[in-house]
Structure formats: structure tokens, C-alpha cells
């Protein structure tokens, strides 16, 4: 299985394996998806226990990295379905850059594109990616 790569930025300048980018704190593209229901509750997920990066952390509905050639919306839709098992229309709201080093030697340094969508049903989570979920 080929190792997942991330897109280095600000203009795309190349690809790098995801783990290496997090080890070297190289700026790369990412996205965060927030799903709301009709009660204006947000769907949160708890990352699966076997994830190398922040296992069991409660986080937004889903977040990941764009693949080469994917738009932000395509990437968000792909990963939302892979992790949470549903599709819904997404809208990109804004983007920002952040850097956050962690105790495990990895650093998030991302140009993060934030998207929102709406869904009122229960997701069908992928246990390889998601431990649990809840509306909050």
C-alpha cells in the first residue's frame, strides 16, 4: 500500500509522505469539515484508538489532507464518506495557517481549509478511523 502524501504549500511545490511532513513541521494543505444538524448541534468524532496521530482525541466531524489533483470540496467529501459513511453538500468558509507542536514529536503546520455541511441522521462510522461520535 502506497504511503499517503500531503501537498506542500503555499503554491503547490511538491508532495511529501504525511508522517514525514508532520515530523519535519513542513507547511502543507489540510481541511476540516464541520457537520451541523437542524438543532445547530455539531457532529464530533473521536479518533480511532489505533491512529498514530492523536488516537482517541475528540475532534471536528472529519479532517485530513487533500490528494494531488483534488479540490478542497472533493477531498472533504471523500474523507467524510470514508470516515463517517455519508455524503452531503459541503461549502468552504475560510482557510487559515497554524502550527502546533506536540509531545509525540509531530507538528501540525497546515494551511487548513474549513468546510461546513448539514446532516440530520446518524453516521455509519468506519471503525478503522473513528472510535465514537456524538452531537454536541
Functional labels for PLM-detected ranges:
Residues 114, 126-136:
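NUDIX/MutT-family hydrolases
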Amino acid at each position: 500500500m502506497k504511503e499517503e502524501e500531503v501537498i506542500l504549500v503555499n503554491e503547490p511545490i511538491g508532495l511529501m509522505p504525511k508522517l514525514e511532513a508532520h515530523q519535519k513541521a513542513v507547511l502543507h494543505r489540510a481541511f476540516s469539515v464541520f457537520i451541523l444538524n437542524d438543532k445547530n448541534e455539531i457532529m464530533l468524532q473521536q479518533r480511532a484508538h489505533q491512529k498514530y496521530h492523536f488516537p482517541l482525541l475528540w475532534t471536528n466531524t472529519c479532517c485530513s489532507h487533500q490528494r494531488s489533483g483534488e479540490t478542497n470540496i472533493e477531498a472533504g467529501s471523500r474523507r467524510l464518506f470514508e470516515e463517517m459513511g455519508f455524503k452531503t453538500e459541503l461549502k468552504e468558509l475560510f482557510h487559515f495557517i497554524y502550527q502546533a507542536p506536540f509531545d509525540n514529536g509531530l507538528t501540525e503546520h497546515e494551511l487548513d481549509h474549513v468546510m461546513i455541511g448539514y446532516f440530520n441522521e446518524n453516521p455509519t462510522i468506519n471503525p478503522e478511523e473513528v472510535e465514537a461520535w456524538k452531537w454536541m
